[in-house]
From Swiss-Prot:
Described function: Forms part of the ribosomal stalk which helps the ribosome interact with GTP-bound translation factors. Is thus essential for accurate translation.
Keyword Ribonucleoprotein: yes
GO molecular function, one term: mRNA binding
Gene Ontology CC: cytosolic large ribosomal subunit
Entry superkingdom: Bacteria
CDD domains, A to Z: Ribosomal_L7_L12 (cd00387)
Protein's organism: Chlamydia pneumoniae (Chlamydophila pneumoniae)
Protein name from the UniProt record: Large ribosomal subunit protein bL12
Residue segments, region Disordered: 94-113
Length: 129
């Protein structure tokens, strides 16, 4: 076949409708005794049959959930300590709960922060991001 005849063939194929292309595919499969389906890839079975474990998050957020009225001053001091906020901002953080005290922090820092808040009388928790 010459380059010219190949270009003509490509042009004709480009003008076929989806239905015509489907029929052409079937005819070629029959003529050449092949299938145009994607090959199936076999996946090796795992040894234990256990589900894959999700990767543990590396960043955490600490949430201040509740502060009893009689513990507010102690919690306020801890919030200032762990966030570095001024008194006014720390006070606002302890009102209208729940509020995120820290974001994108390590697990050990999140655990320490929650422990300090709980020791001061607040209800706090952390979760992975």
């Amino acid at each position: 076949m010459t380059t010219e005849s190949l270009e003509t063939l490509v042009e004709k194929l480009s003008n076929l409708t989806v239905l015509e292309l489907s029929q052409l595919k079937k005819l070629l499969e029959e003529k050449w005794d092949v299938t145009a389906s994607a090959p199936v890839v076999a996946v090796a079975a795992g040894g234990g049959g256990e589900a894959p474990v999700a990767a543990e998050p590396t960043e955490f957020a600490v949430t201040l959930e509740d502060v009893p009225a009689d513990k507010k001053i102690g919690v306020l001091k801890v919030v200032r300590e762990v966030t570095g906020l001024a008194l006014k901002e720390a006070k606002e953080m302890t009102e209208g709960l729940p509020k995120t005290v820290k974001e994108k922090t390590s697990k050990s820092d999140a655990e320490d922060t929650v422990k300090k808040l709980q020791d001061a009388g607040a209800k706090a928790s952390f979760k992975g991001l």
